[in-house]
Amino acid sequence: MAAGSGSGSNPKDYQDPPPAPLVDTGELGKWSLYRAAIAEFTATLLLVCISVSTVIGEKRQSGEGGAGVLGIAWAFGGLIFVLVYCTAGISGGHMNPAVTFAMVLARRVSLPRAALYTMAQCVGAVCGAGLARAMHGGGQYARHGGGANELAAGYSAGAGVVAEMVGTFVLVYTVFSATDPKRKARDSHVPVLAPLPIGLAVLVVHLATIPITGTGINPARSLGPALVLGLGTTKAWSHLWIFWVGPFAGAAAAMIYHHYILRGAAAKAFASSSYRSPHF
Amino acid sequence: MEGKEEDVRLGANRYSERQPIGTAAQGAGDDKDYKEPPPAPLFEPGELKSWSFYRAGIAEFVATFLFLYITILTVMGVSKSSSKCATVGIQGIAWSFGGMIFALVYCTAGISGGHINPAVTFGLFLARKLSLTRAIFYIVMQCLGAICGAGVVKGFQQGLYMGNGGGANVVASGYTKGDGLGAEIVGTFILVYTVFSATDAKRNARDSHVPILAPLPIGFAVFLVHLATIPITGTGINPARSLGAAIIYNKDHAWNDHWIFWVGPFVGAALAAIYHQVIIRAIPFKSRS
């Protein structure tokens, strides 16, 4: 859109960062790693607390002046937008183990960092759900399902996994597009708008799959309320595997799509990969 | 480049109105601050051998697949419930279409142009922004993607899908086919006009908000058109979206109205292309050097 008139033979106008090492011992001694983990913890806590609170509030008022299902979808999408905006520069603004997983597969973050992020996200989600429970009271919280993800009646577990998978694909695909150095260099709208399409991707996925699974697409978000509701016995607990398997599979698929089809390996096989599409 | 700031500030054309139409641009050709790309050839054999051509097709397929999957699933979620208050409602459907177009145009604009819509491809082809082969390839990939997307939604719950209209576009009772056609034409005009404005070389050079925001007004145009015309036709403005749902739903009353959702968008896209190229930009009147 912005660039695009250059011929393919000139030097590249962008630089791909080198792949992150699997284990980077140097970063373990740095404050910035721990600061990033704390930022992930806080952001996930806020995300889960506010969004679960919206879900419980809507169910308590059921239809009379509540935020409505559209309001729930906006709570998730809007919070992701705001929190990615705030934390992108500190930790990358993942707030989602599936996104972190995709980033490991793409070699953008090292393994210890990813493990630390995932832990921080899960702990943050549990604390956030606990905070929401405290706000609404244990009885009300449990009566309205605790904002946990579970499969709606009439849908098979397979449908739930596919719904989670495609939903996470949309999200992670958007994240990859927003953080791609090549796209950033070519289209001026990519770096400027970045958090907005990520938030709106979350919004539209919620609009689509709230009736099926309540929409996880974030294993930490599903884990938090399920743990706070109680171990072992609840429906949310027995369905929890769907909200880990689906998102991770979707994230891996998005990474493969972006990395191999849109960016990398397959293109190199063609000699004339320099042809540019007419930019829109 | 003198007067550019003034031009940007006013958002107006910098040539004085006393100059006759068309000649102004020729006279000032040497100090233009933008470059109009040459028209795409009808058939370009070179691009058939490039990976980026097929990658763009795959990107269109995946984008249309995701678009149909998310939006039809939202429509299903709304229409299966007896009370609209317990669902995301019509506004949620409109957000689903508009938000998805925004996110997908953002993601695929740099790969394929991010059309996701045969009407947009057709409009841009009329303006000679892509070759005929590419346009046909895109449209085929968009339609295939749309069919797959609607198919996955049907796979989730077949009875529910068939019992609730399958998200197919039909003209609502109380409206004539002419009403539906008019709604589709105007709706697509708004969308394609926005696309042309967002991709215009001159506007991109003059107004900094044009290239930076590009996907956002396109998504909003789709959102607003859906708010307006969901009660009339369910809002197509995208022949691939209408075709995908119609093929998977496959009932007579959906097929009877189906031509509207091809004729309407294509006419609207053609009008927008003519409006933008001839009236706004006067490109046919300019000599190309």
Swiss-Prot record, chain A:
Keywords: Cell membrane, Membrane, Repeat, Transmembrane, Transmembrane helix, Transport. One of its GO terms (molecular function) is water channel activity. Residues 1-21 are annotated as: Disordered. Gene3D superfamilies: Glycerol uptake facilitator protein. It is found in: Cell membrane. It is a multi-pass membrane protein. PROSITE patterns: MIP (PS00221). GO terms for cellular component: plasma membrane. Expressed in leaves and at lower levels in roots. The chain crosses the membrane at residues 36-56, 70-92, 113-135, 156-176, 192-212, 236-256. A motif (NPA 1) lies at residues 96-98. InterPro entries: Aquaporin-like, Aquaporin_transptr, MIP, MIP_CS. Its main location: membrane. A motif (NPA 2) lies at residues 218-220. Aquaporins contain two tandem repeats each containing three membrane-spanning domains and a pore-forming loop with the signature motif Asn-Pro-Ala (NPA). PANTHER family: AQUAPORIN OR AQUAGLYCEROPORIN RELATED. Belongs to the MIP/aquaporin (TC 1.A.8) family. PIP (TC 1.A.8.11) subfamily. Aquaporins facilitate the transport of water and small neutral solutes across cell membranes. This is Probable aquaporin PIP2-8. The gene is PIP2-8.
From Swiss-Prot, chain B:
The chain crosses the membrane at residues 58-78, 93-115, 136-156, 178-198, 212-232, 260-280. GO terms for cellular component: plasma membrane. A motif (NPA 2) lies at residues 238-240. GO terms for biological process: response to water deprivation. It is a multi-pass membrane protein. It comes from the Eukaryota. Residues 1-36 are annotated as: Disordered. The keyword Oxidoreductase does not apply. Pfam families: MIP. The keyword Transport applies. Aquaporins contain two tandem repeats each containing three membrane-spanning domains and a pore-forming loop with the signature motif Asn-Pro-Ala (NPA). Belongs to the MIP/aquaporin (TC 1.A.8) family. PIP (TC 1.A.8.11) subfamily. May function as water channel to facilitate the transport of water across cell membrane. Recovery of PIP1.1 expression after chilling is increased by pretreatment with mannitol. This is Aquaporin PIP1-1. The gene is PIP1-1.
